[in-house]
């Protein structure tokens, strides 16, 4: 625990004393301390007998911090304090029962049913005074997720999904008894808000073990509750280029993207790209894995027989539409929705570029232009898709060519990002003034053509640009 964090806790304790309140540290913060797990932006949970919302509001005022009520009915609020180089999230809640012991009894898993008085904690009496009535420390050492009471998933069905996110984050096993109860209670997940489901799903996707837990969630028939669209992907045969049906291929693609991310971990460019926040605390990494899993979601609807062959013409367009609907249901931001849709829509494009072995400058320019901010996501997705495709008609040569071309495109993208952007040779006013054009969609088309020719080195001056513009107008009359 850093000094600034400790000083903040001392301030909170002083304020609690002034209000004659006994504060307990509970749950995940204590669990993470026991695991020696340092978080760049700590979340600290507190509980007190009653009036947590009023306490939090007054504390926020004193600390000059942000404040929000999370759950008025159950007396939960949040205070957010910025400490030099980190955000500290402080959650306060009323006891769930009549006292701290009953509060711990009503928590989700043994590893989270931990508490200590804030005063004892700051006085260094951790091991002597830590409350651990359900063997949470023992379960932490054994690396297992275990429910506390039979009504745990009735009290909050989201805990069903949280069992998997905790297991994925920490590399723990869920006990057989807990899995058995989850199987019985899984239907209750339908009553949980989309936002809460999304957050736990993204926690799973953010780990290096997403593939394993998606497989387990599917085996337990939980994944189809979260993503019902995947059911029609099951057992859809894809023809001789594939060795797996659509759903199995989608799972295997997630497995491969996790391998690829590991291979690229030494690349600061790729690492920084994947760590970019797209919305709130959700990053490109999680969104990429969701895009990889959903890239062929349109295939069942697009499937046709033609000339004795199975084809999926237009599945990327159908899939992008389905992906947008999924994004809306999960309450993803507009930026996330657009990114997910682009990944699915353009996922075939790198393969087309790779088919030519040495794609032209024009083809590369158009790919980067069309895929925009998702150029790298689509390229990584394409690698995973290709590696998960091992039908009898695929060849070692074609696979190596795909890898070579896509790797070169990834390098080129980051190189171009670091280069100073070329100024435009002409703009709309130049076209109106020199070519006597009126404002119209034609101007946008001409400027797009000029930008492309400039990017691939075909024109280098304003004069050349205007000449090409004249030619473009003649050819498109």
At which residue positions do the language-model features occur?
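Catalytic cores of the polymerase beta-like nucleotidyltransferase superfamily
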Residues: 1-477
């Amino acid at each position: 625990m850093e000094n600034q964090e400790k000083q903040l806790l001392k301030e909170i304790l002083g304020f609690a004393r002034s209000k004659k309140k006994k504060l307990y540290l509970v749950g995940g913060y204590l669990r993470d301390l026991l695991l020696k797990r340092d978080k760049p932006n700590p979340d600290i949970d507190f509980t007190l007998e009653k009036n947590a919302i009023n306490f939090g509001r007054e504390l926020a005022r004193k600390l000059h911090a942000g404040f929000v009520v999370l759950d008025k009915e159950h007396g939960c609020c949040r205070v957010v304090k910025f400490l030099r180089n980190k955000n500290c999230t402080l959650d306060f809640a009323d006891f769930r029962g009549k006292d701290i012991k009953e509060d711990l009894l009503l928590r989700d898993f043994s590893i989270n049913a931990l508490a200590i008085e804030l005063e004892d904690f700051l006085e260094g009496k951790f091991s002597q005074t830590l409350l651990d009535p359900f063997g949470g420390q023992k379960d932490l050492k054994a690396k297992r997720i275990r429910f506390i009471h039979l009504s745990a998933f009735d009290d909050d069905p989201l805990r069903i999904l949280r069992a998997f996110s905790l297991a994925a984050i920490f590399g723990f096993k869920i006990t057989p008894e807990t899995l058995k109860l989850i199987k019985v209670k899984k239907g209750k997940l339908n009553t949980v808000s989309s936002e809460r489901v999304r957050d736990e799903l993204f926690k799973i996707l953010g780990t290096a073990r997403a593939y394993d837990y998606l497989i387990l969630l599917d085996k337990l028939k939980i994944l189809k509750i979260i993503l019902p669209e995947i059911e029609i992907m099951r057992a859809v045969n894809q023809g001789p280029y594939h060795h797996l049906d659509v759903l199995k291929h989608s799972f295997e693609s997630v497995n491969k993207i996790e391998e690829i991310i590991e291979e690229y971990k030494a690349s600061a460019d790729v690492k920084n790209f994947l760590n970019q926040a797209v919305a709130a605390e959700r990053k490109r990494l999680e969104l990429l894995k969701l895009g990889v899993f959903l890239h062929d979601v349109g295939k069942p609807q697009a499937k046709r027989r033609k000339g004795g062959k199975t084809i999926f013409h237009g599945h990327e367009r159908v899939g992008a539409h389905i992906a947008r609907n999924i994004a809306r249901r999960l309450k993803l931001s507009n930026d996330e929705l657009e990114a997910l849709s682009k990944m699915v829509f353009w996922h075939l494009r790198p393969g087309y570029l790779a088919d030519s072995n040495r794609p032209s400058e024009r083809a590369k320019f158009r790919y980067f232009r069309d895929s925009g901010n998702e150029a790298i996501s689509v390229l990584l997705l394409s690698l995973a898709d290709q590696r998960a495709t091992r039908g009898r008609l695929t060849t070692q040569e074609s696979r190596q060519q795909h890898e070579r071309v896509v790797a070169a495109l990834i390098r080129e993208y980051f190189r171009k990002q670091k280069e100073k952007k070329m100024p435009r040779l002409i703009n709309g006013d130049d076209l109106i003034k020199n070519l006597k054009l009126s404002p119209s969609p034609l101007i946008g088309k001409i400027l797009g053509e000029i930008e492309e020719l400039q990017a691939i080195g075909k024109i280098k001056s304003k004069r050349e640009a205007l000449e090409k513009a004249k030619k473009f107008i003649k050819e498109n009359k």
